[in-house]
């Protein structure tokens, strides 16, 4: 959530910044107008409460002196009614103000490419050239089906579209990938966490998914009243429970930065994705992802973003997967992010790079919503900065391995770093499936 004081005192700057993220200036004008009325009413209410205290003392004095206090009592009643009306007005204005604030995205960083969509994204660097073959490479969904290690048909029968069974060596490969990711992340200084996979609304609001993105997730409902949500949502990413671990808490400065990592399932409705990536592992309703989260001091967050991005890159490099790093434009970056780097891995059958990680600096945006603060050496409280990044999306990593390491005979060579995690298996063949 943005700081209303920053918007109030820098209105033109705020309009210019948020215009690059699709926010109309009229929304900020309305917000500032509500804020001014709220502060005016709040000040008047506080003044009247002070007056009421004075009148109360006068009444007590008159009663002690056995004087008539009826006029003062009547005056206090009138003041009390006015205070009640003002406080009600302040509460309503506060609700309106928060309604707008909770739906405004983060301010983009000055270095972000400016543009309305991903066509304005800028390549920052590239690692290795795209994989070349002496034959026409197959798509990972065909490779997985032909090898008998991925089964979409039975998953569709059981769960519907955008689900998959991993079979035999497919399941082993998925497990090898996420165990490798977790091991490497812990070597890089992250503490592993196993978080809850169901979270409450306050947690979803803390990381910015609610109230704006309800349609993108799966929420649990009450069996006795299907129209009534239970205040529990299946997590769309481990970022939610990892960041909210620190919600409403004060961290001592000497504990920062904090680095945590977690494997979790991710559940997404993929609303608005009809017709996109209908085959394969790229866009699923349920998938596994290893997440990395950092909590740090404001003056450290930009350096921590670079470290976070390099941690994610390190995983792709050890797997030998070609990729490039892209700085997202103001119109393509996520709601909570001030700056985002996407890591896009090369997919030979699609002849293009596809996102496998997003590494974002959310500055104090999530910390303000979730009240994540730290106490400095002088005892003063400050909002922390939060960062998050995929390290990495497991299913997409499996897809990239199948496509980049495929052989002409239909087999897939296992990347060297994964062989120990695959019980020594160096090649996945048709005999690797189960059914």
Curated annotation (Swiss-Prot):
Pathway: Aminoacyl-tRNA biosynthesis; selenocysteinyl-tRNA(Sec) biosynthesis; L-seryl-tRNA(Sec) from L-serine and tRNA(Sec): step 1/1. CDD domains: SerRS_core (cd00770). Residues 42-70 are annotated as: Disordered. Its EC number is 6.1.1.11. Keywords: Aminoacyl-tRNA synthetase, ATP-binding, Cytoplasm, Ligase, Nucleotide-binding, Protein biosynthesis. The keyword Aminoacyl-tRNA synthetase applies. GO terms for biological process: selenocysteine biosynthetic process; seryl-tRNA aminoacylation. Disulfide bonds: none annotated. GO terms for cellular component: cytoplasm. Residues 42-69 have a biased composition (Basic and acidic residues). Its main location: cytoplasm. GO terms for molecular function: ATP binding; catalytic activity, acting on a protein; serine-tRNA ligase activity; transferase activity. L-serine binds at residues 237-239, 291, 390. The keyword Zinc does not apply. ATP binds at residues 268-270, 355-358. It is found in: Cytoplasm. Pfam families: Seryl_tRNA_N, tRNA-synt_2b. InterPro entries: aa-tRNA-synt_IIb, aa-tRNA-synth_II, aa-tRNA-synth_II/BPL/LPL, Ser-tRNA-ligase_type_1, Ser-tRNA-synth_1_N, SerRS_1_N_sf, SerRS_core, tRNA-bd_arm. It catalyses: tRNA(Ser) + L-serine + ATP = L-seryl-tRNA(Ser) + AMP + diphosphate + H(+); tRNA(Sec) + L-serine + ATP = L-seryl-tRNA(Sec) + AMP + diphosphate + H(+). HAMAP family: Ser_tRNA_synth_type1. Belongs to the class-II aminoacyl-tRNA synthetase family. Type-1 seryl-tRNA synthetase subfamily. Catalyzes the attachment of serine to tRNA(Ser). Is also able to aminoacylate tRNA(Sec) with serine, to form the misacylated tRNA L-seryl-tRNA(Sec), which will be further converted into selenocysteinyl-tRNA(Sec). Homodimer. The tRNA molecule binds across the dimer. Consists of two distinct domains, a catalytic core and a N-terminal extension that is involved in tRNA binding. This is Serine--tRNA ligase. The gene is serS.
